From Swiss-Prot:
Protein name, entry field: General negative regulator of transcription subunit 4
InterPro entries cross-referenced by the UniProt entry: CNOT4_RRM, Mot2, NOT4_mRING-HC-C4C4, Nucleotide-bd_a/b_plait_sf, RBD_domain_sf, RRM_dom, RRM_dom_euk, Znf_CCCH
ZnF start-end (RING-type): 33-78
Modified positions (Phosphoserine) in chain numbering: 312, 360
Region (Disordered): 370-412
GO cellular component terms given for this protein: CCR4-NOT complex; CCR4-NOT core complex; cytoplasm; cytosolic ribosome; nucleus
Biological processes, Gene Ontology terms: deadenylation-independent decapping of nuclear-transcribed mRNA; nuclear-transcribed mRNA catabolic process, no-go decay; nuclear-transcribed mRNA poly(A) tail shortening; positive regulation of transcription elongation by RNA polymerase II; proteasomal protein catabolic process; protein monoubiquitination; protein polyubiquitination; protein ubiquitination
Annotated positions of the Phosphothreonine modification: 310, 326
Molecular function in Gene Ontology: RNA binding; ubiquitin protein ligase activity; ubiquitin-protein transferase activity; zinc ion binding
Phylogenetic classification of the source organism: Eukaryota, Fungi, Dikarya, Ascomycota, Saccharomycotina
Length: 587
């Protein structure tokens, strides 16, 4: 009989599950053992070791019964397992057949889903078949040509004299450009051949970066050496989602960084942009068998072979040394001029001190062939039989003419300035001022002493002192002339303002009288008396206190003065100022 406590728990679980929508649960879902998380077969699904209904696989049941640490109890209800309580459900042949068909259908669906997943992965990776990825531990070097046969090139380059000094090398692949014969003309081929294209796979990225930093842009035996990161592609087995059978496969088997990846279309666009910006690139394929002395002299202006599609600076270096190669000694590296462009590969200088470093790369160094393109393609290019001096001279003149026309066009483009470009004009102005101030030169400045005489100089007022100014004892009568001018034009309208102005001047005059010297001429008291008589108001007008002669008091005073004596007072004042005496009018 089932434990009442367990029965209540099962009933509560059943009631709780009845409140949830279980339609999304599939009957085809595979059952797993709750203990070992392994799929349960048909016999396990029909095996009930405990009356509570908690099912486990037969392996876990035997483990619980035989392991003394597990106490032989049910994980759900903690009831002691007993063989008498074990219940088996026997399936009929029809039920067994249906169960097996169900399992077969599940397995088929599982395989179908796995196939779809692989197809989706292949579809997602299909576009990677034409993608090239920069491999940071792979270095591609062009222009190197050691004086050894082709069979010994790889071991020689792997030695400590060459690239072995930069770190551990896992693999070297040499792309043969020109053949090396064993006859007496081998030195001639070595001297004029363009060199090999070598792929060097280092053990670490730092070793590859150090190799590029020290080798790129140097000259070895008069030949320009270029080094850059090599590019590779994805393994075909990786693209199909299959394991790669080649343990030494050098292709990628994992997704690369997007910043280091580019496809053929992007590469073509970069080449077009570089050709438009950098002009026409001149390349030369093959080698020369018969070159005379005059032809070799005229060929100094020609460009050497450049795998990157851009002109090489080797043509401008006339002082390159061409040592004899009778012995296979260590090559001499000569620093090259810094080529134009930036560092597209992002090479960072390591802490290890290096010599003859040139981190600048040509912007078209991404055009280097890939490792896949060079494997199995060791073809021998055709050679040129004879180059005459006439052809060389014609090519040289055409090259110089094209460069001259491009230079004129560039100068014309630089000379034109937009007059409406405010920012450009401001920058030019600042540049001009900075240039003038940076190149400022001291210029001595002297003033001639005979420009003015001493008498004129003394008459000039001092800038900081008034000691040299002489006080004038004679008045210019400027105030009187101003009053005459005002009264002659409109004597009635300006009477009040003139009286107010004279009263304000009277205060300053009285102050000046106390300061000036006591020895005055007889004319000065008469003149002061005359001015005081002029500013006396009429008898019938009360003198207002000082400070009330504002604009608001002008109208009442003017109305009092505009009686029958207004015109007579104006005439008296005018005659007094003109004749210098006072005329008293009768009442």
């Amino acid at each position: 009989m089932m434990n009442p406590h367990v029965q209540e728990n099962l009933q509560a679980i059943h009631n709780a599950l009845s409140n949830f929508d279980t339609s999304f649960l599939s009957e085809d879902e595979e059952d797993y053992c709750p203990l070992c998380i392994e799929p349960m077969d048909i016999t396990d699904k029909n095996f009930f070791p405990c009356p509570c209904g908690y099912q486990i696989c037969q392996f876990c049941y035997n483990n619980i019964r035989q392991n003394p640490e597990l106490n032989g109890r049910c994980p759900a209800c903690r009831r002691k397992y007993d063989d008498e309580n074990v219940r088996y459900v026997t399936l009929s042949p029809e039920e067994l057949k249906m169960e097996r068909a169900k399992l077969a259908r599940k397995e088929k669906e599982r395989k179908h889903r796995e196939k779809e997943r692989k197809e989706n992965e292949y579809t997602n990776r299909k576009h990677l078949s034409g993608t090239r990825v920069i491999q940071k531990n792979l270095v591609y070097v062009v222009g190197i040509n050691p004086p050894v046969p082709y069979e010994e090139v790889a071991p020689t380059l792997k030695s400590e004299k060459y690239f072995g000094q930069y770190g551990k090398i896992n693999k070297i692949v040499v792309n043969r450009k020109t053949p090396h014969s064993n006859n007496t003309t081998s030195e001639h081929y070595h001297h004029h051949s363009p060199g090999y294209g070598v792929y060097i796979t280092f053990g670490s990225k730092d070793d590859a970066a150090r190799c590029i930093a020290q080798v790129d842009g140097t000259y070895m035996d008069g030949r320009l050496i270029k080094a850059a990161y090599g590019t590779t592609k994805y393994c075909s087995s990786y693209l199909r989602g299959l394991p790669c059978p080649n343990p030494n496969c050098m292709f990628l088997h994992e997704p690369g960084e997007e910043a280091d990846s580019f496809n053929k279309r992007e590469l073509h666009n970069k080449q077009q942009a570089q050709q438009q910006s950098g002009g026409t690139a001149f390349t030369r394929s093959g080698i020369h068998n018969n070159i005379s002395t005059s032809t070799a002299g005229s060929n100094t202006n020609l460009l050497s072979e450049n795998f990157t599609g851009t002109p090489s600076p080797a043509a401008m270096r006339a002082q390159l040394h061409h040592d004899s190669h009778t012995n296979a000694g260590t090559p001499v590296l000569t620093p090259a001029p810094v080529p134009a462009g930036s560092n597209p590969w992002g090479v960072t200088q390591s802490a290890t001190p290096v010599t003859s470093i040139n981190l600048s790369k040509n912007s078209s160094s991404i055009n280097l062939p890939t490792l896949n393109d060079s494997l199995g393609h060791h073809t021998t290019p055709t050679t040129e039989n004879t180059i005459t001096s006439t052809t060389t001279t014609t090519n040289t003149n055409a090259t110089s003419h094209s460069h001259g026309s491009k230079k004129k066009q560039s100068l014309a483009a630089e000379e034109y300035k937009d007059p409406y470009d405010a920012l450009g004009n401001a920058v030019d102005f600042l540049d001009a001022r900075l240039h003038s101030l940076s190149n400022y030169q001291k210029r001595p400045i002297s003033i001639k002493s005979n420009i003015i005489d001493e008498e004129t100089y003394k008459k000039y007022p001092s800038l900081f002192s008034w000691d040299k100014i002489e006080a004038s004892k004679k008045s210019d009568n400027t105030l009187a002339n101003k009053l005459v001018e005002i009264l002659a034009i409109k004597p009635i309208d300006y009477t009040a303002s003139v009286v107010q102005f004279l009263q304000s001047v009277n205060v300053g005059v009285n102050d000046n009288i106390t300061i000036t010297d006591n020895t005055k001429t007889p004319t000065q008291p008469i003149r002061l008396q005359t001015v005081s008589q002029q500013i006396q108001p009429p008898l019938n007008v009360s003198t207002p206190p000082p400070g009330i002669f504002g604009p608001q008091h002008k109208v009442p005073i003017q109305q009092q003065q505009m009686g029958d004596t207004s015109s007579r007072n104006s005439s008296d004042l005018l005659n007094q100022l003109i004749n210098g005496r006072k005329i008293i009018a009768g009442n």
